[in-house]
């Protein structure tokens, strides 16, 4: 007899955008067409599985088989091969990005295996639109225990002993927050869930609402019981229609089952939950602005005190918690404070959920114990940086967070450590940046967002963010001036210390941390008018040319080769580099690392094309016009000491400028370390000799076996009429 299978088809926002709706319909049709009585098709919160770029995803339970990139046309094969014959569809399985090995079960994939999913415990394993699925997983047991077996004070004590801290910002102790609200005088109190989540690239709260809304409702109801509230609000963005839909369904089903409403579970406790759809204002993530929005006022922060626990929504004592905080409450009540406190660090307990995005192989939701090193999250779980790029920094905490450089990769992720590094935990955004990221531009990008979203109520937020943005924009456009960095630091510190709300106080973090850790990039923009990452358009023509150490016009010579104009190509290269054949063999080609084509598949083979053009030239040199010496338009003689690549390059360009130039070399051969250090199989000697002969033909005199020493000094060169001496003696010996 065939085992019964439950097929969970991701129906969350990312997978829906990739066509999972059609996959769901196709699987339904195939199960019916093939008359498979051993299969049930369910929608799921597979977005909570977290591996977003692998969607649309399908999970076949009870074995946990994970299919990726599933399309509607794959449904017939899944139904016939897997569901009917028991054979896995290997081409749709997840494959290890390095080894290419197929990994059938999602629990064996490093991305999942190295996580600890407590907050996301049900995401991807249940149908979020069926409360029975949640109940079957132990849902609402914690609520039953709280309202029937515990007093409100005992609930608060359990949360306090667990060490739960707010997962939406500064990490204020949740138990303490509840206690303050419970002890505040007043007959009417409110509990509010902040599900606004306005950070760009953050989708943790939305994922929980879409994949496991009952966990939030249960946590919110327990919070209401603990502080003595009879009403609660879920403040969610109207631009999250699927999340709004599923929280509505969950609320209706919870009320029908007696988990909400009057006399919950016969306990005498009454509690109702309302949904307030926000208009998408970032500042409404701040708790006082959020309450103003619920009151149908303009969402603007207000000074504190009084704090929300004293005077919040409608002037009543109110408690506001984040989605992840409330979703943690049921497991604490059910499993106990001691269990929860055993996870994490001494001051940061439990797990944290992060939205891992940016330049990362595996983007998605990650849940790990507090104190997990950044390196574990980024490399072991996230799979590292794609396309062989180098890790540069990670930005945590959303647009108000800081950028943490590579030297702190082994730092534990907890509230205290992130604060010491100049960043914040925030709502859990984690944007990975690689070597192609300009840190000045990233600071400008995040500040442009916070400046646009600033409510303008306080002068530091209204004017300070505008002034910082103007300075950063000026710097990225190549118009930065000396002193701009110090001005930025001064304004940022003022905004941080004087802003009215937490958003204003943290928005300078990207500026402060990028200056602190990447000041050299700011100085390059201002002093050299150069963007080291080749990102700022105003400071470059093309990324490859900008990155080339000698600034060769790479697009031009590549275009010449494409048109069959090989001589014009080599002439273009020699405008900036007299060694095209040598560099075509041994250059480390940083230009290819910045090639825009590499973002699609593979970079253009710039070095190989350079070698091709140079080899073509020397293969056809007898058919080409003989190179003529550059005309000598200057009367000042110049001596160059050393016939290595530096000395020969200097002599070549001096001759090009019209100066009579002579190179003095102690050895019997030119090329310096090119000739005496690089093996012949890597750089043939005849290639070096051809390049040197070309330089000599352009008018550079080279005198071998002529060391400059005590017997023949620089003063002797001056006596011989040389008015300038360039010393390119090299560094043959270690310091």
Model regions: which residues?
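Glycine-rich FAD pyrophosphate-binding loop
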Residues: 659-675
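Ferredoxin-type iron-sulfur electron-transfer modules in oxidoreductases and energy-metabolism complexes
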Residues: 1-5, 20-43, 62-91, 133, ...
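Hydrophobic alpha-helical positions that pack around
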Residues: 114-115, 244-370, 382
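Conserved phosphate/anionic-ligand binding catalytic regions in large, soluble enzymes, centered on
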Residues: 15, 159-181, 223, 280-292, ...
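Flexible inter-domain linker/hinge segments
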Residues: 93-161, 314-315, 321-336, 540, ...
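N-terminal Rossmann-fold NAD(P) dinucleotide-binding loop
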Residues: 647-648
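FAD-binding core/adjacent interface of flavoenzyme oxidoreductases
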Residues: 172-174, 557, 589-641, 656-657, ...
């Amino acid at each position: 007899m065939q085992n019964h299978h439950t097929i969970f088809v991701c129906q969350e926002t990312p997978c829906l955008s990739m066509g999972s709706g059609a996959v769901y319909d196709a699987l339904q049709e195939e199960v019916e067409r093939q008359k498979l009585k051993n299969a049930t098709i369910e929608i799921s919160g597979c977005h909570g599985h977290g591996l977003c770029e692998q969607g649309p995803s399908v999970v076949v339970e009870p074995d946990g088989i994970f299919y990726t990139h599933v399309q509607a046309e794959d449904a017939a094969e899944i139904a016939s091969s897997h569901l009917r014959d028991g054979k896995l569809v290997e081409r749709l399985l997840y494959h290890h990005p390095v080894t290419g090995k197929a990994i059938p079960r999602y629990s064996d994939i490093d991305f999942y295996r190295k996580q600890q999913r407590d907050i996301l415990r049900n995401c991807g394993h249940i149908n979020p639109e069926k409360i029975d699925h949640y109940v079957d997983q132990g849902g609402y047991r914690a609520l039953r225990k709280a309202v029937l077996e515990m007093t409100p004070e005992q609930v608060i004590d359990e949360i306090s002993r667990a060490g739960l801290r707010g997962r939406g910002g500064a990490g204020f102790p949740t138990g303490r927050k509840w206690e303050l609200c419970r002890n505040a005088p007043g007959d009417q109190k409110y509990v509010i869930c902040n599900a606004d989540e306005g950070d760009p690239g953050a989708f943790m709260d939305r994922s929980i609402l879409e994949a496991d809304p009952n966990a939030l409702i249960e946590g919110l109801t327990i919070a209401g019981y603990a502080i003595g509230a009879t009403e609660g609000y879920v403040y969610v963005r109207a631009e999250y229609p699927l999340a709004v839909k599923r929280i509505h369904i969950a609320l209706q089903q919870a009320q029908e089952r007696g988990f909400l409403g009057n006399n919950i579970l016969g306990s005498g406790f009454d509690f109702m939950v309302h949904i307030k759809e926000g208009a998408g204002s970032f500042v409404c993530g701040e708790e006082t602005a959020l309450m103003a929005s619920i009151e149908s006022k303009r969402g603007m922060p207000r000074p504190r005190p009084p704090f929300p626990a004293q005077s919040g929504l409608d002037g009543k004592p109110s408690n506001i918690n984040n989605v992840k905080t409330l979703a943690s409450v049921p497991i604490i009540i059910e499993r106990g404070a001691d269990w929860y406190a055993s996870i994490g660090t001494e001051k940061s307990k439990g797990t944290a959920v992060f939205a891992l995005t940016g330049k990362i192989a595996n983007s998605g939701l990650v849940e790990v114990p507090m104190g997990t090193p950044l390196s574990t999250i980024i490399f072991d779980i996230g799979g590292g940086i794609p396309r062989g790029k180098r890790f540069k920094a990670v930005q945590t905490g959303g647009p108000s967070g800081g950028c943490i450089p590579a030297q702190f990769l082994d730092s534990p992720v907890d509230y205290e450590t992130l604060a010491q590094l100049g960043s914040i935990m925030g709502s859990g955004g984690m944007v990975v940046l690689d070597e192609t990221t300009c840190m000045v531009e990233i600071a400008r990008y995040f500040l442009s967002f916070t400046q646009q979203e600033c409510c303008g109520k306080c002068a530091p937020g209204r004017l300070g963010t505008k002034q910082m943005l103007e300075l950063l924009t000026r710097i990225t456009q190549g118009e930065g001036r000396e002193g701009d960095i110090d001005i930025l630091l001064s304004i940022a510190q003022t905004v941080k210390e004087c802003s009215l709300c937490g958003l204003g106080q943290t928005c300078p973090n990207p500026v402060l941390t990028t200056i602190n850790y990447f000041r050299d990039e700011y100085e390059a923009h201002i002093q050299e008018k150069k963007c080291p990452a080749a990102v700022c358009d105003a400071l470059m023509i093309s990324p490859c040319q900008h990155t080339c150490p000698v600034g060769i016009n790479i697009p031009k010579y590549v275009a010449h080769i494409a048109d069959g104009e090989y001589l014009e190509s080599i002439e273009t290269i020699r405008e900036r580099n007299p060694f095209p054949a040598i560099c075509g063999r041994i250059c480390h080609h940083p230009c290819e690392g910045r090639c825009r084509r590499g973002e699609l598949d593979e970079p253009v083979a710039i070095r190989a094309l350079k070698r091709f053009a140079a080899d073509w030239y020397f293969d056809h040199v007898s058919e080409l016009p003989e190179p003529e010496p550059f005309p000598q338009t200057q009367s000042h003689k110049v001596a160059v000491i050393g016939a290595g690549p530096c000395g020969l390059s200097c002599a070549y360009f001096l001759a090009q400028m019209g100066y009579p130039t002579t190179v003095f070399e102690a050895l019997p051969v030119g090329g310096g370390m090119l000739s005496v250090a690089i093996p012949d199989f890597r750089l043939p000697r005849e290639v070096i000799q051809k390049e040197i002969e070309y330089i000599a033909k352009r008018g550079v005199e080279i005198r071998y076996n002529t060391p400059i020493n005590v017997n023949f000094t620089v003063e002797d060169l001056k006596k011989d009429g040389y008015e300038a001496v360039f010393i390119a003696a090299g560094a043959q010996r270690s310091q």
